[in-house]
């Protein structure tokens, strides 16, 4: 891609890196003025990632593998770092992995944020992160064959269903709080929802000592499906379906990744329309979570009222794109349909109505003593991890739309509720500005050139955090590799730290404050580390206890 070197970001960081590690960088390739991929010597991979992460304000949203044996004879691992210091940019650190040994040095001992990504690379490609502290499977089930790795190019057809290798659960749950505690899992996971998960809460009396959990029970294989059965244009509509709540955010992230790879300039009006729909999506997501927050503290009147107002955001989506869910609008290079004058006026009317409704509901919410009493001081997250890609790396039209960055110092459940309240009002203001200031440009860029094996990142600040996609184009209008990372993928690993030191009745509030992308955790295993006894109970029972705080499920 032709990038004007005078406007390239990250050059000072790369110069410092090359000085710190002479000869470490083997290759350097620009995707955009704000994205660069460097190939480094594999033995220096942990040193380079650690240096960028700690010395240059790096953040590690995503890492992934790729089977590039048909391109260069190797596998590859990519660590995508968001540089958030004075010079904001993306630096992707790549290392080639020998196809025979399949070994590469684990980054996790240096940068713990890499643990889930390296476990997934091990599952999906059979690569071996030497020194990885947690050797458990992440994505693949217990009964999956040891020598079958789904994302290898020669491994399997996505339709293959291998015979199970075991008929029992073998996943070892870990209790870091008390290594002597005996864990006795009771009963199988009973799947009653689309997205189940299995939690283990290790408790001493009512206090949570540690927590562990197993997810990925309904892994859909979307990346394999995209690479084998779809053209890169068709994947746009698959990306819409990654999540039932923030599907449009994934669609923007995916199209943005391909547009960055091919150097496509998206018309400004399309950028504005994308931003409008992203804020509509943020509205209905935040209002949903505010309603659930009311429910978790026993304030079901607030739950019903927030869901009543949320209906107006769904009406807004239907008005703008013809569907109550924000599906099917994006194309690579722009959007499929315009926002006409009558739609704009009706949307502005809904914005005014929602602002009045939400103001009244928030006043009622904050006047409910149980809300602050139950949510302050629990589920604390370190304030240093707070970030918002709309500000750090503006995309779509976020560089032009006025917006406010909201932070609360508590880092607890109450702070997360209040950030959603403030962002709801800000989304309404952003919608008004964008609808009143729509540029007069085309909606779609057409006639661009397809470049096999071009690649780039795309990203969006979804309601739950950042969605980050990476796309490498292949031959015949297909994708060679698509990495789709949802916001909750990065939120789950920190949950155990949020739960520690809190009580069992706090668990639903803490989990709900992340607004995780899963339908229901059907069962929770409670392990009493003092009595060395365990009990498996329905999650609804834990939720009930969190609301009324009577009849403990531990007894």
Indicate residue ranges for each PLM-predicted region.
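Terminal low-complexity/charged segments
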Residues: 1-207, 367, 371, 427, ...
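Metal/cofactor-centered catalytic core regions of large enzymes
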Residues: 45, 112, 138-555
């Amino acid at each position: 891609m032709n990038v004007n070197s005078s406007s390239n970001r990250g050059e000072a960081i790369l110069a410092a890196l090359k000085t710190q590690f002479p000869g470490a960088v083997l290759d350097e390739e620009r995707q955009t003025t704000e994205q660069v991929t460097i190939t480094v010597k594999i033995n220096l991979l942990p040193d380079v990632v650690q240096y960028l992460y700690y010395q240059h304000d790096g953040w590690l949203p995503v890492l992934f593998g790729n089977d590039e044996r048909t391109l260069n004879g190797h596998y590859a691992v990519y660590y995508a770092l968001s540089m958030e210091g004075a010079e904001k940019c993306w630096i992707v650190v790549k290392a080639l992995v020998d196809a025979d040994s399949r070994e590469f040095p684990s980054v996790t001992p240096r940068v713990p944020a890499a643990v889930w990504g390296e476990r997934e690379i091990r599952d999906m490609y059979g690569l071996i992160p030497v020194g990885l502290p947690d050797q458990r499977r992440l994505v693949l089930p217990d009964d999956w064959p040891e020598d079958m790795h789904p994302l290898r190019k020669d491994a399997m057809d996505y339709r293959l269903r291998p015979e199970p290798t075991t008929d029992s659960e073998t996943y070892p749950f870990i209790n870091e709080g008390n290594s002597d505690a005996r864990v006795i899992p009771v009963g199988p996971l009973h799947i009653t929802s689309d997205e189940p998960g299995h939690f283990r809460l290790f408790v001493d009396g009512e206090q949570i000592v540690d927590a562990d959990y197993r997810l990925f029970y309904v892994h859909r294989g979307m990346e394999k499906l995209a690479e084998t059965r779809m053209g890169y244009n068709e994947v746009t509509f698959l990306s819409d379906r990654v999540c039932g709540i923030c599907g449009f955010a994934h669609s923007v992230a995916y199209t943005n990744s391909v547009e960055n790879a091919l150097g496509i300039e998206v018309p400004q009006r399309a950028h504005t329309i994308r931003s409008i729909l992203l804020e509509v999506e943020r509205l209905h997501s935040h209002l949903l979570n505010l309603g659930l927050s009311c429910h978790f503290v026993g304030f079901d009147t607030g739950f019903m009222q927030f869901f009543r107002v949320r209906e107006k955001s769904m009406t807004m989506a239907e008005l703008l794109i013809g569907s109550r869910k924000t599906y099917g609008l994006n194309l690579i290079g722009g959007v499929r349909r315009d926002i006409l004058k009558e739609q704009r006026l009706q949307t502005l009317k809904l914005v005014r109505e929602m602002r009045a409704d939400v103001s009244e509901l928030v006043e009622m919410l904050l006047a409910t003593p149980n809300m602050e009493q139950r949510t302050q001081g629990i589920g604390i997250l370190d304030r240093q991890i707070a970030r918002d890609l709309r500000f750090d790396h503006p995309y779509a039209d976020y560089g032009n739309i006025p917006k406010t960055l909201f932070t609360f110092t508590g880092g607890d459940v109450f702070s997360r509720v209040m950030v959603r309240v403030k962002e709801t009002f800000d989304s309404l203001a952003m919608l008004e500005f964008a609808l009143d200031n729509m540029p007069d440009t085309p909606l779609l860029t057409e006639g661009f050139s397809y470049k096999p094996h071009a690649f780039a990142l795309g990203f969006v600040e979804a309601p739950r955090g950042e969605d980050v996609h990476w796309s490498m184009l292949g031959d015949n209008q297909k994708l060679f590799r698509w990495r789709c990372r949802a916001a909750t993928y990065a939120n789950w690993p920190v949950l155990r730290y949020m739960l520690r030191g809190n009580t069992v009745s706090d668990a639903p509030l803490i989990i709900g404050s992340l607004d995780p992308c899963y339908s229901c955790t059907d069962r929770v295993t409670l392990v009493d580390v003092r009595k060395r006894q365990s009990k498996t109970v329905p999650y609804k029972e834990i939720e009930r206890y969190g609301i009324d705080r009577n009849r403990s499920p531990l007894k």
